């Protein structure tokens, strides 16, 4: 029998980490012995468990240890993290370690070193001179980089669920469902947003064109103007239709106020792109007085950065759209590590793309009328996301109303 001792520390009972660990061992065909367990008696007390993991083969044992590592289990006997040099650009050494989106440490030089820029599905590269470790995607690996391999000397710390009330993240902790009280949910989200902003935190918005189609662009624009959005991630579509709405009062040629298609309205979004091209950029259009309202206008006027990532289906695109997806991803990376919350609204593509580079400590709200969007986001590793399955046209105005009420801003 092949064995290895692992440890779990923290709120392992409340966060269900201990039962998940035991389930993993048994479901994968292993066995276990609990060697020691110390359960915290007060709300602030962490718990600790030592577990002997048993498996029939070394290969199975390693597979179990890999799965346990992803939920925060660490090998009990501390050894230095093993490093090997990358043999070529964009080529990894065998048995490389692939990161989760949880806070991660490696044991290097006799001390635990936190991995900087953590995100899922990346490699840990160590700089021996500065004694630092940071995440790198495979495309950024250079020949000679010292890459962490194996399982030794790696500690993963998932977000814990402390005892006590946790606002919307406790309330919404069940499966994806539309059968949840919408207004109550929105009030809790508004409360979280208010608390984050009061302590100087930062909030990102990931938005799809349905925001404009449902007539909610002025509401998001007001949220930006009031300082509740600190960065915007979107695609060509949201920006194009927002500008179309600002210039012509339509979205995809449909009058926003009357809900009716207008004559030759199918040209409006191309007209909008043409006007921005003529001005030079979205910022130029604002400064020249061409664009005087809307989401993109408020971003420019309030110095809120935006990243517009292109896709293969884009019309135009607008000159501000980054058509190289790797470049767009790197631009998004500049902002995600400093965020405290991300609100994802009606865009499966950009929500999942953002989720892939978000640390798990960032509170994440995903709003979509399609339950598959929030399910796919969670399935792809963004387990910290909570879902609101509803029409964004109903969600956004109520959210702003509650935020303004909580902050004494009137209506």
Curated annotation (Swiss-Prot):
Record-linked InterPro entries: ArgZ/ArgE-like, ArgZ/ArgE-like_C_1st, ArgZ/ArgE-like_C_2nd, DHS-like_NAD/FAD-binding_dom, LOR/SDH_bifunc_enz_cons_dom
Q: What is its EC number?
A: 4.3.1.12
State the similarity comment: Belongs to the AgrE/ArgZ ornithine cyclodeaminase family.
> What keywords is this UniProt entry annotated with?
Lyase, NAD, Nucleotide-binding
Which cofactors must be present for this protein to function?
Answer: NAD(+)
Which residues bind NAD(+) per the record?
236-237, 315, 347-350, 368, 391-392
Tell me the domain of life. Archaea
Q: Top-down, what is the taxonomic lineage of the species of origin? A: Archaea, Methanobacteriati, Methanobacteriota, Methanomada group, Methanobacteria
Q: What exactly does this protein do?
A: Catalyzes the conversion of ornithine to proline, with the release of ammonia.
Q: Which organism is it from?
A: Methanothermobacter thermautotrophicus (strain ATCC 29096 / DSM 1053 / JCM 10044 / NBRC 100330 / Delta H)
Protein name, entry field = Ornithine cyclodeaminase
NCBIfam families for the chain: TIGR00300 family protein
Reactions catalysed, semicolon-separated, are: L-ornithine = L-proline + NH4(+)
């Amino acid at each position: 029998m092949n064995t290895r001792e692992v440890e779990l520390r923290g709120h392992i009972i409340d966060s269900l980490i201990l039962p998940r660990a035991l389930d993993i061992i048994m479901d994968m065909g292993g066995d276990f012995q609990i060697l020691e367990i110390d359960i915290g008696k007060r709300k602030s007390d962490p718990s600790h468990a030592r577990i002997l993991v048993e498996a029939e083969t070394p290969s199975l044992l390693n597979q179990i240890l890999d799965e346990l590592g992803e939920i925060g289990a660490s090998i009990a006997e501390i050894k230095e993290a093993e490093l090997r040099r990358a043999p070529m650009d964009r080529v990894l050494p065998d048995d490389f370690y692939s990161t989760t989106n949880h806070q991660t440490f490696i044991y290097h030089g006799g001390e635990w070193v936190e991995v900087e820029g953590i995100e899922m599905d990346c490699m840990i590269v160590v700089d021996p001179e500065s004694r630092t470790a940071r995440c790198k995607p495979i495309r950024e690996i250079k020949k000679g980089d010292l890459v962490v391999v194996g399982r030794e000397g790696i500690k993963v710390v998932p977000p814990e669920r402390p005892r006590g009330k946790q606002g919307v993240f406790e309330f919404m902790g069940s499966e994806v469902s539309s059968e949840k009280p919408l207004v109550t949910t929105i009030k809790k989200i508004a409360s979280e947003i208010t608390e984050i902003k009061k302590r100087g935190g930062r909030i990102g918005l990931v938005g799809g064109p349905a925001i404009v189609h449902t007539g909610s662009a002025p509401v998001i624009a007001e949220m930006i103007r009031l300082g509740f959005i600190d960065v915007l991630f979107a695609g060509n579509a949201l920006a194009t239709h927002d500008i179309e709405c600002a210039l012509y009062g339509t979205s995809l040629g449909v009058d926003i106020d009357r809900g009716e298609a207008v004559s030759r309205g199918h040209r409006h979004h191309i007209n909008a792109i043409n006007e921005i091209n003529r001005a030079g950029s979205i910022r130029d259009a604002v400064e020249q007085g061409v664009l005087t309202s809307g989401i993109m206008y408020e971003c420019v006027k309030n110095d809120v950065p935006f990243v517009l990532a292109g896709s293969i289906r884009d019309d135009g695109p607008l000159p501000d759209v980054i058509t190289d997806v790797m470049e767009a991803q790197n631009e998004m990376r500049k902002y995600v590590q400093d965020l405290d919350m991300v609100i994802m609204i009606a865009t499966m593509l950009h929500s999942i793309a953002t989720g892939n580079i978000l640390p798990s400590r960032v509170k994440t709200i995903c709003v979509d009328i399609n339950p598959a969007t929030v399910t796919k986001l969670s399935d792809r590793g963004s387990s910290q996301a909570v879902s609101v399955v509803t029409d964004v046209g109903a969600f956004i105005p109520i959210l702003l109303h509650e935020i303004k009420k909580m902050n004494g801003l009137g209506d």
